[in-house]
Each structure stands twice: as structure tokens, then as C-alpha cells.
Amino acid sequence: MKNSIPIDLIIEIVSRSTAKSVARCHCVSKQWRAIFRRKYFIELFLTRSKARPRILFVVQDGEWSEWSFLSLPQPQNSSLVVESADIHMKKFSAGISGSIYFTYASGLIYFKCMRIPKEDEDEKPVLCDPLTGKYVILPEPRVFGMYSYLGFDPVDKEFKVLFMASGYTASKDVDHYILTLRTGELKWRTIQCPFTHEPLWTRICINGVLYYSAMNSDGNYVIVCFDVRYEKFKLVDTKCRSEFNGLINYKGKLCGVKLKYAYRVGFPVKLRMRVLEDVEKDEWSTYVKVKVKQNLSVAGMTATGDIVLFMKFASNPFYVFYFNPERNSLEVQSVEIQGLGANPDRIACNAFVDYVEDLSVNDAMLQLNSIPLQQD
């Protein structure tokens, strides 16, 4: 009589593996496939994944704007060197190029314009899973628009694309569009915005609310709040004279970050944060000085409370920097990533913190009949 491994032990072992390993387990038997698609296992796997977060880099390669997706373990201490062997990489195959304008939400990336020669010579909106390298070509709205954003509703587990029609100004007098990414026909629906504004590209989705920077009709900088589930807009005044350099998730709240560079003395950075406590109230934090001689961007705040800055352009070596604003720390913890900056044709980088493997995201892409990328 054969000794079998208890199913509870199998679940425990597989829940600590990778999404790729789970996918292989689906092929073992129908029973295993059913077990690993249960809600209980998907939530258990996500809990385990959150204990090993990664940093996701979206790297623009060459003058034709080809894209690579790289992720690496999110360092938990200073002076750490991340070897190239720890980097997971997916890349669009040769000839695929896209706009620099893209948005990220809950593990997926939405490109407003992407050209995939084997599919179509024209540029199309594309949804991509950087973990698996799969993508979905989305239908195009029948109207012109400069700005569109990806959001995620954590209650109904749905991704939606918000498309603001017309040119640089989103008028309250025209129809805008929204696309829900679910099984079946992908179809744009009209939606109205109660106020006229000029959208900007600084954006983030936090707990089912999509936030993006904008200017109102008076020329003041504002934040547009879009409830992804209920599809409602709200306007929040930033009381700032310039746009935020980045929007980050500050313990579940929106935080606008401003970086001030003193160019004459070698790029020391002054960082200022403004936290939105609710839609009616916000407050400024104190200045934090960061002594770094680099041209940096803000990736976000980790679950441990560290703000992550990264080098805007690829170099060799490539560094990310950590500091904790609550301690008002003046010392930057630097992490060297070997291999990321080795390609001289890489133009620009974007980064996202606390990137975790989520099986529900993989299922969403499967339901949309996603297509695998070719990996270089």
C-alpha cells in the first residue's frame, strides 16, 4: 500500500512556492487543480507572498521604447547587494514598442499605446502581467483621449480602465469611458465626470480608489479621486503651486511627495510629504533631508514604513535608496543591484514597491485569454 502525502501538507508546501510552481501543480491532476484554485488557497498564497515582497522595475530599452519587466527581492537591510541571479525578468519580444505612458495597479500594467507587429501594425491599448509576461490587447475607444488609467476594485476583484475623452482637458460636458476587465465581451461604457479638469500622469490606486494629479479650471493643482467600484469622481484641492513628483501609499492613505533639487551642489534632495487624511482634511509633514547625489524618483513606501527612491536612469551599478520618514532619518540606506544597469541602451526606469505574486491576478489574465510574451 502506497504512503500518500497528506493534502494539508501539500497545501502548506505549495503555498510557500512561486506562482509558476502553482501553475505546474495544476497539471498534476484534476484534484490538485481544483484545490489550488480554491479561494482558501488563493488567499493563503497571497498571505505567504506578502511576507516576501519584491520591487518591480519597468525599464525602457533603446530609442524605440522597448520594455523589460524586472523584479527582485525587496531588501530588508542596508548595504545589501542584490545579485543579477535574483532578478526575475520578462521582456517584450523584438519589435514590440510602446508609449512611455502606462499605469500600474495590483500587479498589472496598462499601456495606453503598444505596437505588437505580429498582432497589428497599429498601436493598441495593452494590459500586461509582468510576472508571467502575458498580455491582452484591449479594444480602443472610438474617441480621442490623451489620458487613461488602470484601477482595481479589491471588493469585487475587478480591474477597470478609466479613459478621459478629448484632448488635454477633460470636460464635464462630454462622455468619458470605462472598461471593466472581466470574462466575456470587453466593451467600453460611457461615464460622466461632474467637473472640468486637466488630467496629469502622476497617479496611484489605493484600496479601490484611483488618484491622479490634475489642474482645475482655475489653474490650481488638484487630486482627482475616482472610486473604482462605484465609479464616482471627487476633487480634492492640494493647495500646492506645483504638481507632486509622485503619489505613494502611506499606510493606506494617499501621500503626495515633492522632491526639491539643489542642482548647484550636486543633487542633495529635500523631500516633502503631504498626507490626505480623508477627502475633507489633509496635513503637511516635516521636511526630510536626503543626502544623495543622484537624480531620483519615488517608488513608494514599503509595508515596513520605508520610502524607496530609485535612480531615474539606468547605470552600472544601479542603486535604490531607503529611508524612514517617521524617524526623520538623514542617513540613506543604499542597495546595489548588479546587472540592472549593464545595458547602455536603457533610457529610463520606473519602480513599484511591495510587489507580490497574486494568483487572483493570474486568473484574471487567464479569463481574458491572455497571450504569452516571448522572453529574450
Curated annotation (Swiss-Prot):
PANTHER family: BNAA05G37150D PROTEIN-RELATED, F-BOX ONLY PROTEIN 12. CDD domains: F-box_AtFBW1-like (cd22157). This is Putative F-box protein At1g30930. SUPFAM superfamilies: F-box domain. Disulfide bonds: none annotated. Residues 1-44 form the F-box domain. It comes from Arabidopsis thaliana. InterPro entries: F-box-assoc_dom_typ3, F-box-assoc_interact_dom, F-box-like_dom_sf, F-box_dom. Pfam families: F-box, FBA_3.
